[in-house]
Amino acid sequence: MHVLLLVAHGSRREESNLEIESLAQKIALFKVKEFEVVMPAFLEFAKPSITEAIDNCTVIGATKVTVLPYFL
């Protein structure tokens, strides 16, 4: 299973973190054949952290993870 990990900085403002989660959901709706799962991860201030997200990838059986940095 190939996972796209959308990595953002994270914010103390919950609204900003929700925007990243929403973006990950929108990318997943495109049904890009290369990725079975799209999930967000955050550098700081929000969950899941990058490490937690990679652990989640292992739990769901990912065989490949592509990290897409999304920093503004």
Give the positions of each predicted feature:
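Active-site-proximal alpha-helix that buttresses catalytic centers in soluble enzyme cores
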Residues: M1-L72
